[in-house]
């Protein structure tokens, strides 16, 4: 007997309605989000879509970048339409794809069903049929002319006074004019369609996860804001700069730094009120807003104990006020008093005074000083002589530490050059003043039972500080040191200790080293950076007064180098050691080393921000710097192992004039560097320079509901392509266009590189020059799987019809990887071949394995083998798959493939040891297990990404998909799709991967206006009167099929385990 599946469409559930429990699905219009159309974009009132019980979505105003890359915290999330059902039908097994998520729903006791909230209302599902319910989004195709209008709009904006501020960037405008011409040429050859050609979310989704949806530009290595360049050296080369340390963090105000005002107010409070309870509480309150120095340590200092510490420590801060109101230490006053009591003498002369009648008053002063202070300061006696000897020894040691270059050090509260002859009148006066300071402060201090601090240390340290605010700030740190010990960092956020450390660090970034030096205590300084230069990007905070630094620019240029050569003298002995270790059967992970160890080349620096280091100080205590390595300013040097890749070093000077306004009209300022250095990701990853370039994504605008007409990131992407005389297509919206351009460019470059083993041995520079002259074929890959398979088939010259889903599933599994690849006759031939050139062709396995969809590589296991041809034969090197990037990058290994082998050795047969290495290499990659990348965190964001794409084109439609299992006469699956004024043709296209498999029973589309039946079942639409109200009822009759019970899906999946 046939059974029936009932779907009820009603406006509202009004009361206890038990007869409605008989329906399997109820669709109401309650809380439906109103559809709107703005400038041709179909969407919803987006503010009403936040946090509904459907696809987990945060506020519609959150940026798409934050939505994609952040861990969204909410009740749960629906997954993208899952593969595990079709895996069961198609393969008879369950493949772990990690695409399960916690569901967002609620049990409704009124109708005893489970409730969700798609945009078109509220839906209720019977529990037995609910486990296979999923959300789906359609990005609607918009008018293509709207997307193309960006060209004229952009050119007009770049010329506007609002953007240029009276200064036109000539290089940028020239490139934009070239881009405009290329864009119009591209439009001429495209098909004359009115609407966006395609919306394929998967390629964008995969490129985002691989961090390739955008472009790359050189990192800025800017001078650390703790230093500034001495003005007279600013125009010189970097190596000739003299640096001066900036003592206080707030003296150098940063652009867009809103915390400075609060910090300056806090300093004024310290200056006027010292460390009263209210000031201490303000310090803690300010620091608690941040957590840069917070950790997990507990055991906070009690507030009352901290106040008692400060009450004592502030008595060590001995200062007086001048009439003008400025703070000044008592040192100057005491110094003037001492000078009045000595005979008239030149300050630079050695301190010698003969006892006679003329100097009677001076010696009387010395005797009185000895009675009052207990110290003999007579310059003719042993105390002064002993002090001179100790200081001279100290000065000599400090100069030796500074590479025997003179510098100034602090002696008795004054700075003295280490090459000066110590013992002058001025030196004696400073010595006496220091003794007086120590004695007077000692009489004023309040005693406290310190645990670690010593009274003499505190007196001496405070006397060395001339800044009253710094004295008070350091009192707080000294209190923490005495209470906690040497390590005052790492306390949990919210603790007083963490807040105080945060506040003092923002006032005085070098407080750790200075407190240690001045007070002679062992305060931990491990967190304090010693870098002279720090990495910055175009969106970093820059000083309004300008910043200075440098950058590396890499590119390709034709040289005399030929790719048909072997690696020779530039290869280190480590390569031969690794070769022998693998022959001896040793484990790869224990033998492989840093890739730099395999080449004798000191041009490449794995820490480019540290290419300049300290070189001591000059006589005025200005820091001198020196260069490490051979790279010099304005030099272009070609890497010895990659002879077509040139490295150029340039000094940077960024001023306010480099600021630009955001094209989206938000009046957000940003710094823009030399746009001619921009590169598409596909091209940038052909060079080791990836480690000195940074990735800029195209995730701009809100995560849904905002139509981005243009953005600075999109301008940068287009300029990066224009730098190589290429452009993206304009027959689709910009999100899809940029993804298509990146994948098509990658397809072109990778296939050109690997087909060299079977054809002409071209260099990378030839490939890039050919690209710039003739462009590349623009493909339309429906998914990343299609792109992946197309590359492999092109390289292996295979023309079979292969299902991409099947192929990628087989490649991802160790058990079936080798057998799948041996389906390609060319692969089988190179595996059997004993020729050198065919063996080197096996390096394509790195691309096959690491460019799979969703692949993740552990940073602890990031080095893998690559084959090279050496003068002594076939060899191995370890390559780094990350290459300094946040994600897997081909830049860590592709550049080493440019050099192939010498022409006369290409057809050489391998010897026994080399054949053993080849076999080991093949086995390594056939059995290499890899994890899936980021799927548990990102899989549910697939539909959210589709919503963003639609928001930037023709709009969005919301759907709910239900998979209904059948058990007789054989297991099958019926797809039911619910929507609101949806597109049945799009639904048929979206379901094609599921309706095409064996076991599929077709689909039925239902919305409030129509019903489309493309299944093997009879569907009837009827009216039902329910307590005086007219509703709509849809009945699906099973015919000779039998609907599965509530356990059927579990039973189907259980068979595959």
UniProtKB/Swiss-Prot annotation:
Compartments (UniProt record): Virion
CC terms in the record's Gene Ontology section: viral inner capsid
The organism's place on the tree of life at top rank: Viruses
Pfam family, one: Orbi_VP2
UniProt KW keywords: Capsid protein, Inner capsid protein, Virion
Keyword flag Transcription regulation: no
One Gene Ontology term of the molecular function aspect: structural molecule activity
Keyword Oxidoreductase included in the entry's annotation: no
Main localization (coarse): virion
Function of the protein: The VP2 protein is one of the two proteins (with VP5) which constitute the virus particle outer capsid. It is the major target of the host immunogenic response.
Recorded family membership: Belongs to the orbivirus VP2 family.
Name used for this protein in its record: Outer capsid protein VP2
